[in-house]
Amino acid sequence: MSGTAELLLRKESFEDVANFYNENLTIITAGKIPPNPSEMLASRAMTAFIKEMKEEFKYIILDTPPLQAVTDAQVLSTKADGVLLVVRAGSTKKDAVLNSVDLIEKVHGKIIGTVLNGVENKKNNYYY
């Protein structure tokens, strides 16, 4: 499936890679993994693409692999207005979270919040 990689390499157009679900949701997948993904994400073409998308859309979400796995999230954090860390309850270790914060801060990314997922919902313990 074609996506961001093909768009940045000028093999496909925006219309060819964009999946228009409704008037409020458009998704562009990563596409085929290039030989140098971090370089491609750090490129001027990626910066220009994000700038164009900011003119077209109100919100842009860049879903990346975990910070501990590859540098993609760290690279893209410098191009984003903010970073949301996603942490799984009962699974993600505190040291991994602290290391992730450090990695984002090293490149001057802006952490705007944390999403805690995988939390068990207990109906009887619900309160404000």
Name these PLM-found stretches.
Residues 1-128:
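P-loop NTP-binding module
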